Regions:
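"A position-specific structural signal for the A-helix of alpha-solenoid helical repeats
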Residues: 6, 40-41, 74
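Short, small-residue-biased leader/transition segments that mark boundaries at the very start
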Residues: 1-5
Length: 92
């Protein structure tokens, strides 16, 4: 369990987000009782790729599994970014 998460975190940090997403998705698929951490890491990988919707979806799943998850602050950060850009779109 920890090895998969550590490896995925390292892949994300190295920019190999597609491999991290694949590993985490397989891990989640094979263990229905996972905690929030794989979803938080998936959110990070999607955020790094610029896929805001998938990032939010995974952060929300992490928060549902653990309301104290670090995904709470990650979700808030994305919402602030999206709100900022949406305001800019209205001012053009």
């Amino acid at each position: 369990f920890r090895r998969v998460l550590f490896r995925s975190k390292t892949l994300i940090e190295q920019g190999d987000t597609e491999r991290a997403i694949h590993a985490l998705t397989n891990f989640i698929r094979n263990d229905a009782h996972v905690n929030d951490e794989p979803y938080y890491l998936l959110g990070n990988a999607y955020r790094k790729m610029g896929d805001w919707q998938q990032a939010l979806n995974n952060y929300l799943e992490a928060i549902e599994r653990n309301p104290e998850s670090p995904a709470v602050s990650a979700r808030d950060m994305i919402m602030n970014i999206l709100n900022f850009y949406n305001k800019d779109m209205y001012n053009q």
